[in-house]
């Protein structure tokens, strides 16, 4: 596709530092990271959303009041609560991120410097999710994700940031239009961009909500889904 003059971007909920190394080995032209909180093109950061410092430090007390566990996601570190009983998915995330090549991938909420762009929350039957939304909705948008049974799972993103917004930034930077964009997705956090672009492609193994909100469904990822869709649209 690149040989035919097309730019290829990764549009991910992850911040750049925690993008899988296997992804970074490919010569992508750019990245939309952290649900639109950072836009990178040809190795340079074109846009980055900086969260207010007081806001970042105010979140811990709200999370504790609402009995919600979270992971703050930064470009160089992720921050974890110090708790005797972390939810199982939190432990799994920490163990996975600890293996990255970053200098200090794991930090904690009591760190004097909180450098993060977005965060994820996990809830159980004791959590007060509605109260959390009420306390934070002025500053954040919420993306309901597939449950990590028995835990609820949401991404919390600075208000106005999204995967769709990241696409808009790139389109404007390149002087292109949304009509020239082709978007691939398989998860509920892809819906903002899949419903934003006309040429939206769901992988065949996508969640039902995704399959119902795209213009084209390709084969599953393990059955050359991306290649087949690129051929279908004449991009290769």
Segments (PLM) and residue ranges:
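Short beta-strand/loop segments at the ligand-binding rim of alpha/beta enzyme cores
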Residues: 5-9, 174-181, 198-199
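Residue-level signal for inorganic ion chemistry
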Residues: 1, 12, 119, 167, ...
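Active-site phosphate-binding/coordination module
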Residues: 2-89
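Short, structured coil segments at secondary-structure junctions
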Residues: 26-27, 35, 139-140, 196-197, ...
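Conserved acidic, metal-coordinating active-site core of Asp-based
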Residues: 62, 68-69, 73-184, 188, ...
